[in-house]
Amino acid sequence: MGDVEKGKKVFVQKCAQCHTVENGGKHKTGPNLSGLFGRKTGQAQGFSYTDANKSKGITWQQETLRIYLENPKKYIPGTKMIFAGLKKKSERQDLIAYLKKTAAS
C-alpha cells in the first residue's frame, strides 16, 4: 500500500497539469479523475476520449491503474495521454493510494 501524502506530491508534480480530482471539477487536457475507481475506461462524462480508450473496456481499480501508470501507451495503444509513465513502483503505489482517497466518488 502506498503513502497518500507522497502520492499527492506525485500527483501535483506529474499529473495536475492535465488532471484534477475535484468532485464536480471541469476537465482539463485530461479528464477529471473524480470517481475514477470502478469506472470503465473512456467513460468520464463530458470528456472527448480516443476510440482506443473507449474500447479498452477495463474497469479502473488498483491493479489496472498499476499497469497503466507504468506505461500508458503500452497498456492502451492509441491513448492521447502523452505522459510516459511512472517507472518507480513506489511512486505508482503512492499515487494510487492518493487517487483512491481523493478520487473516490
From Swiss-Prot:
<dbReference type="InterPro" id="IPR009056">
    <property type="entry name" value="Cyt_c-like_dom"/>
</dbReference>
<dbReference type="GO" id="GO:0009055">
    <property type="term" value="F:electron transfer activity"/>
</dbReference>
<keyword id="KW-0007">Acetylation</keyword>
<dbReference type="GO" id="GO:0046872">
    <property type="term" value="F:metal ion binding"/>
</dbReference>
<dbReference type="Pfam" id="PF00034">
    <property type="entry name" value="Cytochrom_C"/>
</dbReference>
<keyword id="KW-0349">Heme</keyword>
<feature type="binding site" description="axial binding residue">
    <location>
        <position position="81"/>
    </location>
    <ligand>
        <name>heme c</name>
    </ligand>
</feature>
<feature type="binding site" description="axial binding residue">
    <location>
        <position position="19"/>
    </location>
    <ligand>
        <name>heme c</name>
    </ligand>
</feature>
<feature type="binding site" description="covalent">
    <location>
        <position position="15"/>
    </location>
    <ligand>
        <name>heme c</name>
    </ligand>
</feature>
<comment type="function">
    <text>Electron carrier protein. The oxidized form of the cytochrome c heme group can accept an electron from the heme group of the cytochrome c1 subunit of cytochrome reductase. Cytochrome c then transfers this electron to the cytochrome oxidase complex, the final protein carrier in the mitochondrial electron-transport chain.</text>
</comment>
<keyword id="KW-0249">Electron transport</keyword>
<keyword id="KW-0813">Transport</keyword>
<keyword id="KW-0408">Iron</keyword>
<comment type="similarity">
    <text>Belongs to the cytochrome c family.</text>
</comment>
<protein>
    <recommendedName>
        <fullName>Cytochrome c</fullName>
    </recommendedName>
</protein>
<keyword id="KW-0496">Mitochondrion</keyword>
<dbReference type="GO" id="GO:0020037">
    <property type="term" value="F:heme binding"/>
</dbReference>
<feature type="modified residue" description="N-acetylglycine">
    <location>
        <position position="2"/>
    </location>
</feature>
<dbReference type="InterPro" id="IPR036909">
    <property type="entry name" value="Cyt_c-like_dom_sf"/>
</dbReference>
<keyword id="KW-0479">Metal-binding</keyword>
<dbReference type="GO" id="GO:0005758">
    <property type="term" value="C:mitochondrial intermembrane space"/>
</dbReference>
<keyword id="KW-0679">Respiratory chain</keyword>
<dbReference type="InterPro" id="IPR002327">
    <property type="entry name" value="Cyt_c_1A/1B"/>
</dbReference>
<feature type="binding site" description="covalent">
    <location>
        <position position="18"/>
    </location>
    <ligand>
        <name>heme c</name>
    </ligand>
</feature>
